[in-house]
């Protein structure tokens, strides 16, 4: 770490502008030497964002080996090896409903990716429209979307791939700047929605305040087919004994009669297996009926064996919460090491 500290001091030296050429040359040679020393260590660090460690993946291994044991029938008698059940088996719904805070008729269990669910939801809106809309979004001269920033680049990539104009909304310590959001959506009917990661949003870990959630729920968009894409990816991913809390957007929207404005998403990707978990969408019962009527042309049903594995492994929402404590035990010490080293080695340089 000492070499890294020295490199940082060199890279962020505050007196470059007044140094002589020979001093700069010497400093460059010193930095190159230290860089070469780091390279010689042969470190193979996977810095990919959001990938659980092998130890974290091991936490769910029994799901793959002992959960089914030849019994592939759901509790309602569905053979999960076969076709059918568009919106997910009962026990999978019951497992995932508390993560979003929705009722039985307000959820669809999808495949292995919430990102895919979000993309599909956006694509259907563009091609087919949403509940209450008079035409598909794509039939408008232009489609605009509010994008709180900093935000999730893959959300923005969805917009980019579909030719949707993105409008930046600044973040505050309470979440997206709702003064800006309220003004923009009330003035422009081509603004069809907004992205939001409401809990522990990267990179600052911001969770939307109660007031922010209530203002989301009470938005009055000029577009009658406006939708909030509420990507609650980290709804159970707590690392402290005093976790953040988040109001239930759908329940708040029901109080204002605007529940059809809400699409909520989550998954077990960072709970069980990335790329091998369960993804799900929550919305009003009317929205769910409408979405299912569109989805029926897209799929006969998702992977029910995976749904059954998850339901039997976790058993219930309490099982998920206990499982997340095991993740915390593995992750929290790593956070502490990084933060301690940043404070010790980098902070003294003034950054």
Predicted features along the sequence, with ranges:
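Short, intrinsically disordered, charge-balanced linker/junction segments flanking boundaries
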Residues: 12-16, 337-351
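Conserved core segment of the aminotransferase class I/II
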Residues: 110, 251-332, 341-345
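Conserved PLP-binding catalytic core of the aspartate aminotransferase-like
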Residues: 54-55, 164, 349-351
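Hydrophobic "anchor" residues on beta-strands that sit immediately upstream
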Residues: 193, 227-228, 263
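N-terminal "arm"/small-domain region of PLP-dependent enzymes with the aminotransferase-like
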Residues: 18-87, 97-98
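Conserved core of the PLP fold type I
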Residues: 72, 78-224, 235-257
